[in-house]
Amino acid sequence: MSAALFSLDGPARGAPWTAEPAAFYEPGRAGKPGRGAEPAASAMYDDESAIDFSAYIDSMAAVPTLELCHDELFADLFNSNHKAGALELLPGGPARLGGPGPAPRPLKREPDWGDGDAPGSLLPAQVAACAQTVVSLAAAAQPTPPASPEPPRRSPAPPAPGPARDKAAGKRGPDRGSPEYRQRRERNNIAVRKSRDKAKRRNQEMQQKLVELSAENEKLQQRVEQLTRDLAGLRRFFKQLPGAPFLPGAGAADAR
């Protein structure tokens, strides 16, 4: 019994470990450590095959993130009936439950992922498609800088409706061929002529007034020149006269 347990658990002490998978889910080992191995254990281990996850680990390491592809990535890997598999893996099969039952089905052999013709070869293609999708989404999420700043376009504001605009919209003039329109045109022409004539008369009056003021200015300048000459003659006259004999106040003061 001890020799059988030692041979199932692994090699002898000091020997290198092999790459064969360990029996982690053997029901007889976990509950009763002292119970011997059953004859069905060898057949169960013969049907088992190891799965190499190195290809998937490398592909997952190359992809930035596979959050969007987790369901698709592991859907085919673990898509099996675990309840039926557990019943088949138990030593004795359905016969242990008691009573005659259906014949035990053969164990499902895991497909070889390295074989290109097997149905499981679709999983690497799914991983590659998920990687391309994630890379494209990451590239699309990066913000692109604007090419050139464009000036903001301002939409023309609609004119505010006012009382004058409402009156102009509500009041429409007569037709151009009607006599009322002609009469209004004649009145407008007469008013324009009168305003023009009035402006001309004002211009002529201002020109005439300018001429008169210019003539008066010349006369005033001549008057100023005449007064300046008279003042100069009077100064010369008073400078030539003696000052003492002609002062009556000075003579009266001396007599006293």
UniProtKB/Swiss-Prot annotation:
Q: Report the Pfam families cross-referenced here.
A: bZIP_2
Biological process GO annotation list?
DNA-templated transcription; regulation of cell differentiation; regulation of transcription by RNA polymerase II
Residues in coiled coil: none
Start and end residues of each bZIP domain: 178-241
Q: Which residues carry this modification: N-acetylserine?
A: 2
What ranges does the record give for the region Basic motif, renumbered to this chain?
Answer: 182-209
Answer whether the UniProt record assigns the keyword Lipid biosynthesis to this protein. Answer: no
Against InterPro entries, the record matches this protein to: bZIP, bZIP_sf, C/EBP, C/EBP_chordates
- Cross-link Glycyl lysine isopeptide (Lys-Gly) (interchain with G-Cter in SUMO) mapped to chain: 108
Region entry Disordered: which residue ranges? 18-40, 92-121, 139-206
The record's subcellular locations are: Nucleus
- SUPFAM superfamilies attached here? Leucine zipper domain
Q: Tell me the GO molecular function terms.
A: DNA-binding transcription factor activity, RNA polymerase II-specific; RNA polymerase II cis-regulatory region sequence-specific DNA binding
Composition-biased stretches (Pro residues): 143-162
Tell me a GO cellular component.
nucleus
What CDD domains has UniProt attached to this entry? bZIP_CEBPD (cd14714)
Region (Leucine-zipper): which ranges? 213-241
UniProt keywords, alphabetically: Acetylation, Activator, DNA-binding, Isopeptide bond, Nucleus, Transcription, Transcription regulation, Ubl conjugation
Binding partners and assembly: Binds DNA as a homodimer and as a heterodimer. Can form stable heterodimers with CEBPB. Can form stable heterodimers with CEBPA and CEBPE. Directly interacts with SPI1/PU.1; this interaction does not affect DNA-binding properties of each partner. Interacts with PRDM16.
What function is annotated for this protein? Transcription activator that recognizes two different DNA motifs: the CCAAT homology common to many promoters and the enhanced core homology common to many enhancers. Important transcription factor regulating the expression of genes involved in immune and inflammatory responses. Transcriptional activator that enhances IL6 transcription alone and as heterodimer with CEBPB.
Similarity section: Belongs to the bZIP family. C/EBP subfamily.
Name under which the protein is recorded: CCAAT/enhancer-binding protein delta
Provide the species name.
Bos taurus
